A protein has these predicted regions:
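Intrinsically disordered, low-complexity regulatory regions enriched in Ser/Pro/Gly/Thr
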Residues: 1, 28-29
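Short coil-to-beta transition motif at edge beta-strands of beta-rich domains
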Residues: 1-13, 19
Length: 70
């Protein structure tokens, strides 16, 4: 998995069923950790670290907040 991938938390996580977008890949650390942004309606974005064991790949995000089109 890489930055801007859409993931869903599985049953191993308290956020199970929630969708998020990988914001950072801390691939150089061991174990590998991902910073995942989970949009919360009317509240903004919560950021959660996960080692990849409780997320499943859904797809690639096309529009990502903070990115500009070239």
């Amino acid at each position: 998995m890489t930055v801007n991938d859409v993931v869903q938390f599985n049953e191993k996580h308290k956020w199970r069923g929630s969708l998020g977008i990988i914001s950072k890949d801390k691939g150089f650390d061991h174990p590998r950790r991902y910073l995942i942004g989970v949009p919360i309606p009317d509240s903004g974005i919560d950021y959660i670290f996960d080692d990849g064991s409780s997320i499943e790949y859904i797809g690639k995000a096309v529009l990502v907040e903070g990115e500009e089109d070239d």
